[in-house]
Amino acid sequence: ATSLSTPKLSTTLSSPTLHSLLYKHKFSLLSLSNPIKPLHFNFLTHSRSTPSSLSCTRRRFTAPRAESSNGADAPRHYDFDLFTIGAGSGGVRASRFASNFGASVAVCELPFSTISSDSTGGVGGTCVLRGCVPKKLLVYASKYSHEFEESCGFGWNYDVEPRFDWSTLIANKNAELQRLTGIYKNILKNAGVTLIEGRGKVVDPHTVDVDGKLYSAKNILISVGGRPFIPDIPGSEYAIDSDAALDLPTKPNKIAIVGGGYIALEFAGIFNGLKSEVHVFIRQKKVLRGFDEEIRDFVGEQMSLRGIEFHTEESPQAIVKSADGSLSLKTSRGTVEGFSHIMFATGRRPNTKNLGLETVGVKMTKNGAIEVDEYSRTSVPSIWAVGDVTDRINLTPVALMEGGALAKTIFAHEPTKPDYRNVPAAVFSQPPIGQVGLMEEQAIKEFGDVDVYTANFRPLKATISGLPDRVFMKLIVCAKTSKVLGLHMCGDDAPEIVQGFAIAVKAGLTKADFDATVGIHPTSAEEFVTMRTPTRKVRSSPSEGKAEHDIKAAAGV
């Protein structure tokens, strides 16, 4: 699934928006003009059991007779306390936690496949099978070519050019995915969750149909995630999406990647590192809309230096297949020929088609995202939703947070709202990006007066490798309170470094706290605690749209 600013939770559709790595996503919150029923958190009729008793006995909770939202009497007894449709990150987390709290839980999921469809999926969901994990494995594979180049300056010589075998990588990747989906199945089994293979569809507020068999449940959770979206242009049948790109039979010789978001940049880095010729076509002037402006500029420059060709302000219009099998991409500025593959990384859509949600009254946005309140409850009181299907912040750790919060809300008598403040994120481009907190533009708008610290330097490794690699780091600080509002980095190990600093930003530490921290030398990370002089001071009232910049010498250059 982001700018990752803190969303202000609201129950109106006019609430502030949040960018989700590339794309601008509105929080899908229910309109006050048609409010849902108030939450009643005493969902279970028995007294709360102690953790020790729950670990020994799986209890079947009996719900009192209730009037369902469609006016029909709900059944007195249910097959399950929770029935989850979709065994991705959020669904598995919610189901496992709910079961640990003593609820009877079932999960349905489609049969395993590396490529998703209306009839295939797999336990583990997008992240494990078609996203984070396989993508990161391919990133690892692609980085070796750059490391071979770096090693020459350190005295390494190769009598024979290292050879890469695509089929070996894909076979080993798929074996790892099979192992991981098995682990997820065991997690559910060990938690006492019933796993049902098949396609689930909501029949009424308390009934799910799985391939013709009906199951009743006190609560239903929708966690079906999203699917890649390819625009409908002439020749789109020749295009591939991110699912297919992770499982191609052969490595592309020359690939066009349409899109300028994090998925596009990650795959551009992968195929460039594997020695494919890579062209990236974007509609904007710069990549990564929704990210910090200086990060956008920096990563584009660095990726260009590695041989990736960017075609800016170009919109795809058609794909043409030649007699020799090669593909041509026609854009608003002309035609580029000779591609072996054309990949679209133009966003993802919630996977809500044919789930029966409209018929039971679940409200959705125009793009199919399920509208939920702050507790992940839909417009139908017994139906809930977490993860990418709600189009909030489309990140795996966020889906995990939402799933855990939902289980506490329903089954632990602990109404829990997911906390979207200062969610860290990464782009595994080459070089990679890590960020947490506000972008500079957001900080100025919200706080007015900010001090900006930046460093742009050649890392120690590059001084001997001879390659043009650089690192960019940025701190955004509230001038009045000295609180660190945002932290951004592009360079080797940025995601690993930012994960640690995310704790500091989340905890509300100040620039003085950073300054008082002893750095680890020699590292790139130490720059975050050694920047002393602001690159610029921005002085502006939050309510005014104007800002004055006091430019000073850049720190760390």
From Swiss-Prot:
Active-site residues, record numbering mapped to chain: H521 (proton acceptor)
Interval spanned by the transit peptide: 1-66
Biased composition (Basic and acidic residues): 545-557
Disulfide cross-links: C127-C132
EC number annotated for this UniProt entry: 1.8.1.7
Secreted in keyword set: no
Swiss-Prot/TrEMBL GO biological process terms: cell redox homeostasis; glutathione metabolic process
A Pfam short name: Pyr_redox_dim
Entries under InterPro entries matching the protein: FAD/NAD-bd_sf, FAD/NAD-binding_dom, FAD/NAD-linked_Rdtase_dimer_sf, GSHR, GSHR/TRXR-like, Pyr_nuc-diS_OxRdtase, Pyr_nucl-diS_OxRdtase_dimer, Pyr_OxRdtase_I_AS
Free-text remark on how the cofactor is bound: Binds 1 FAD per subunit.
Residues given in the record as FAD binding sites: S89, G90, E109, T126, C127, K135, G200, D388, T396, H521
Catalytic reactions on record: 2 glutathione + NADP(+) = glutathione disulfide + NADPH + H(+)
UniProt main location, coarse: plastid
Keyword tags: Chloroplast, Disulfide bond, FAD, Flavoprotein, NADP, Oxidoreductase, Plastid, Redox-active center, Transit peptide
Gene Ontology cellular-component annotations: chloroplast; cytoplasm
Residues involved in glutathione binding: S89, Y184
UniProt: NADP(+) binding residues: G260, I263, E266, R283, R289, G347, A426
The UniProt record lists the keyword Repeat: no
Signal sequence coordinates: none
Role summary: Catalyzes the reduction of glutathione disulfide (GSSG) to reduced glutathione (GSH). Maintains high levels of GSH in the chloroplast.
Subunit relationships: Homodimer.
NCBIfam families noted in UniProt: gluta_reduc_2, PRK06116.1
Note: The active site is a redox-active disulfide bond.
Descriptive protein name: Glutathione reductase, chloroplastic
